[in-house]
UniProtKB/Swiss-Prot annotation:
Its main location: cytoplasm. The modification O-AMP-tyrosine is found at Y402. It comes from Pasteurella multocida (strain Pm70). This is Glutamine synthetase. It catalyses: L-glutamate + NH4(+) + ATP = L-glutamine + ADP + phosphate + H(+). It holds the Pfam family Gln-synt_N. Its cofactor is Mg(2+). Residues 17-101 form the GS beta-grasp domain. One of its GO terms (molecular function) is ATP binding. Belongs to the glutamine synthetase family. Gene3D superfamilies: Glutamine synthetase, N-terminal domain (3.10.20.70), Glutamine synthetase/guanido kinase, catalytic domain (3.30.590.10).
Length: 472
């Protein structure tokens, strides 16, 4: 869709749905969405040329207060009617621009994703990078947490939770709930959220996403997944933000709360965001070939780049301290940096396909707290580095990696074991990200500073488990 056609479509939607406000949405470094709403009478064609000024100093990691002015530049092709606004509202996703140069801001995650795609095209390796993330989430009935000088606690609860088998309910306990690790593809009445997910799917379709399936996930306490069709990198990152927005709002309307934390409960599976990837050139799948599992040599090199840079990638694909409570053996989390066909214990899997044209790779270590613009861009840059430098990943590992003896395990590299380790790796291994000025040094430094504050805060906070282990 050309800009002219896309802009015309914006005004068509405004008229068709009697839109009263236009919400300009943007994403910060941490992946959180923000928005500014404009009365519809202020929305004209000039908005798509001049943008809307806002205070960049109020967004963590962006501008100093003495250089705060920045521009929200709406992208007309992202226009979609907000299904949750009571007053008719049109949503437009924005990139961030510098008003002095009218160029994209180097710390804007969406602009980083666009630069990654442009860099890929400049190499001649591919025209399109296709991403298909699979974010998992929990639906809870009740979430509470308290952090102060003299106490620290949290609790989550859900009618599906295994710990509620003996709980007294006013209408009685019907006992239909998945036990620990017993929820995969459960059906009603054990799966209490089927209709909620179906409603999410219908709204996602209204907003332009293509739904492939939805189902209950492995964990107890309401773990779910909705699978959507792949798309090009930046567009899929946009769609991932829409996905989270819809899941959170539909849950809220049903008296539930959606949780995208990788490990909100102890002793059961966490939530991942497996990322399916392939490259396309002239309409052909670059990853299709005659090597292992139907991959091309280019695809193997792409895998090699991801494995080589995995610990640095973890800073973007697993950007929270909570992420590393998921990345431990025993809960279907892929911690070992190996690749294999259909082997879900490997961190990089080659899913089985019925059509060779659909061949792809799946990175299994990312989680849904990742900023999709940064995570997808970083994965692409690592893969491209592998292709350019012909980094072969070695032999595939087709055995169950969870059952390997210690002498074999020590020869297989692993993902980072903490956010601190991931940030240390990123400090040392970042040049593959700065090619083509995709990620700038200033952005990487700002990102590390923000994330180190999170690590330091957790490190300085006494934990209830410490009292259990050490108090008496």
């Amino acid at each position: 869709m050309s800009d002219t056609t896309a802009i015309a479509n914006v005004f068509k939607l405004i008229e068709e749905y009697d839109i009263k406000f236009v919400l300009l949405r943007f994403t910060d470094i941490k992946g959180k969405e923000h928005g500014v709403s404009l009365p519809v009478n202020l929305v004209d064609e000039d908005l798509f040329e001049d943008g809307k000024m806002f205070d960049g100093s109020s967004v963590e990691g962006w501008k100093a207060i003495n250089k705060a002015d920045m521009l929200l530049m709406p992208m007309p092709e992202t226009a979609v009617v907000d299904p949750f606004a009571q007053i008719p509202t049109l949503s437009l996703r924005c990139s961030i621009y510098e008003p002095s140069t009218m160029q994209s801001y180097d710390r804007d995650p969406r602009s980083i994703a666009i630069r990654a795609e442009n860099y890929m095209r400049s190499t001649g390796i591919a025209d399109e990078a296709l991403f298909g993330p699979e974010p998992e989430f929990f639906l809870f009935d009740d979430v509470r947490f308290d952090v102060s000088m003299n106490r620290s606690s949290y609790s989550v609860d859900d009618i599906e939770a295994a710990w509620n088998t003996n709980k007294k309910y006013e209408d009685g306990n019907n006992a239909y709930r998945p036990l620990k690790k017993g929820g995969y593809c459960a059906v009603a009445p054990i799966d209490s959220a089927h209709d909620i997910r179906s409603e999410m799917c219908l709204i996602l379709e209204e907003m332009g996403l293509v739904i492939e399936a939805h189902h209950h996930e492995v964990a107890t306490a309401g773990q779910n997944e909705i699978a959507t069709r792949f798309n090009t990198l930046t567009t899929k990152a946009d769609e991932t933000q829409i996905y989270k927005y819809v899941v959170q709002n539909v849950a809220y309307e049903h008296g539930k709360t959606a949780c995208f934390m990788p490990k909100p409960i102890t002793g059961d599976n966490g939530s991942g965001m497996h990322c399916n990837m392939s490259l396309s050139k002239d309409g052909k799948n670059v990853f299709q070939g005659d090597k292992y599992a139907g991959l091309s040599e280019t695809a193997l090199y792409y895998i090699g780049g991801i494995i080589k840079h995995a610990k640095a990638l973890n800073a973007f694909t697993n950007p929270s301290t909570n992420s590393y409570k998921r990345l431990v053996p025993g809960f279907e989390a892929p911690v070992l940096l190996a690749y294999s066909a259909s082997n879900r214990s490997a961190s990089i899997r080659i899913p089985a396909v019925t059509n060779p044209k659909a061949i792809r790779i799946e990175a299994r270590f990312p989680d849904p707290l990742a900023n999709p613009y940064l995570a997808f861009a970083a994965l692409l840059m690592a893969g491209l580095d592998g292709i350019i430098n012909k980094i072969h990943p070695g032999d595939a590992m087709d055995k169950n990696l969870y059952d390997l003896p210690p002498e074999e395990l020590q020869n297989i590299p692993a993902v980072a074991s903490s956010l601190e380790e991931a940030l240390n790796a990123l400090e040392q291994d970042y040049e593959f990200l700065t090619k083509g000025n995709v990620f700038t040094q200033a952005f990487i430094d700002a990102f590390i500073t923000i994330k180190r504050k999170e690590v330091e805060r957790l490190n300085m906070t006494p934990h209830p488990v410490e009292f259990e282990m050490y108090y008496a």
